[in-house]
Amino acid sequence: AASDVYKRQLLFIGIGAMIDFGPLLSQPVMFLFGAAAQFGIFFAICVATLMGFDLKDAASIGIIGAADGPTSILVSQIMRSDYVGAIAVAAYSYMALVPIIQPFAIRLVTTKKERQIHMTYSPKAVSRSTKIAFPIIVTIIVGLISPASVALVGFLMFGNLIRECGVLQSLSDTAQNELANLITLLLGITISFSMRADAFVRVDTLMIMGIGLVAFIFDSIGGVLFAKFINLFIKNKINPMIGAAGISAFPMSARVVQKMASEEEKGNIILMHAVGANVSGQIASVIAGGLVIKLVSQYL
């Protein structure tokens, strides 16, 4: 079991090596949207508990709302959930369905006028030293706030440090391609062993899929409502759709938000703002996973 968890953590090195935190560092306010868009996780945990799942299983199911397949699998493995296979299928299925789910969720809580809001993009310059220091600082801060998250965030940030240091290009390329692809393949094979028909084709699986969908929808709605709340206090309004990009499905969610903005009004470019929020969601989802592990472990 320990080796399985280790394999999953290695995948975060590959993910970290793929991420450019530049759009986020040039607009630090986007950190808030990544945090706000994790609301669905905790809402789904409550729903799963009310539906009769054990706390460890409910916590694992709720993490589907992180819109992050590796985090969902890792948390369910650490919590020793009985539904690892169903959770993995739900997490990756809904990640693929982001272009269908998110527009529906966004339109539920926004008006056409809000979706047409233009945002100026004037990023601050981000130095190489800042990009190198960022993963180190994040790991230290997360370690102080939520030590249980370091196992996840540390690997993610280590991968990003390999990318940004500028002297380990071959390692960076390997992490982004060979390592990520190999671990993904091994991950799929490992999960498949827990997906026997008698253990997978059950009513519980349908319930998990349903709760996962609720988590995804409420993630998007939570981010949008947070953006609308912020707009009450600022002069230069934020397009509320940016809040929905705070989930971890990178870069799919940012593309969906930009596509919707263009459909509402041609020439409305909010892609870089959406990417900043989307990158923030990558960090926030991993931290949320660590927090859930810590909080639930205290009651088991």
Task: Outline where the language-model segments fall.
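Short, small-residue-biased leader/transition segments that mark boundaries at the very start
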Residues: 1-6
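Entry/N-cap segments of selected transmembrane alpha helices
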Residues: 24-45, 197-223, 274-278
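Membrane-embedded alpha-helical segments of transport systems
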Residues: 36-44, 63-72, 83-102, 131-133, ...
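Membrane-embedded hairpin module used as a gating/binding unit in multi-pass transport
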Residues: 93-167
